């Protein structure tokens, strides 16, 4: 049983390691698609503790500041489209430097638990990829 679980774990790791890095255009379209899913592109959107263009929580702002090693972002920055994208890229730069789109969406939807739980955030990934593919097809 342990061998099967180890093999399955290695397969999941292998899939993540072989993921293609998104181009700048693909990455920007992915961010657009996440924002469409999260807030309908509304930088003033609010849903409980989640605020702004990318629906950022206070916990995420704190994590971005921890990564930056200083207080670079404020809670009000969540209302700025540009600062929201910068926070998204800060998180992804630390935890997803390979710009794997599946992992990017799962981290955004489920949090850092997605790094260990490969099913976390999969529903959001499927929903966002529908938006993404539609958006890319319109270009």
Language model features by range: what are they?
Residues 4-13, 19:
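Sec-dependent N-terminal signal peptides
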Residues 18-27:
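Cleaved targeting-peptide boundary
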Residues 26-42, 88, 104-111:
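Short, functionally critical alpha-helical segments immediately adjacent to catalytic or ligand/cofactor-binding
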Residues 29-61:
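N-terminal targeting signals for Sec/Tat export/insertion, comprising classic cleavable signal peptides
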Residues 39-45, 112-122:
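Secretory-pathway/luminal and periplasmic proteins that interact with or process carbohydrate-rich
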Residues 58-116, 124-134:
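Alpha-helical segment that forms one wall of the substrate-binding/catalytic cleft
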Residues 138-139:
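Short, solvent-exposed mixed-charge patches
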């Amino acid at each position: 049983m342990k061998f099967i679980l180890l093999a399955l774990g290695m397969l999941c790791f292998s899939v993540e390691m072989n993921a293609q890095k998104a181009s700048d255009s693909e990455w920007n379209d992915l961010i657009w698609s996440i924002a469409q899913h999260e807030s309908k592109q509304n930088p003033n959107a609010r849903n409980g503790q989640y605020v702004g263009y990318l629906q950022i929580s206070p916990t995420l702002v704190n994590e971005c500041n921890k990564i930056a090693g200083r207080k670079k972002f404020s809670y009000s920055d969540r209302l700025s489209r540009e600062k929201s994208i910068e926070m998204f890229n800060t998180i992804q730069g630390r935890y997803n430097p390979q710009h794997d789109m599946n992992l990017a969406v799962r981290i955004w939807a489920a949090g850092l638990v997605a790094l260990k739980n490969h099913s976390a955030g999969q529903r959001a990934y499927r929903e966002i990829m529908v938006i993404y593919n539609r958006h890319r097809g319109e270009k």
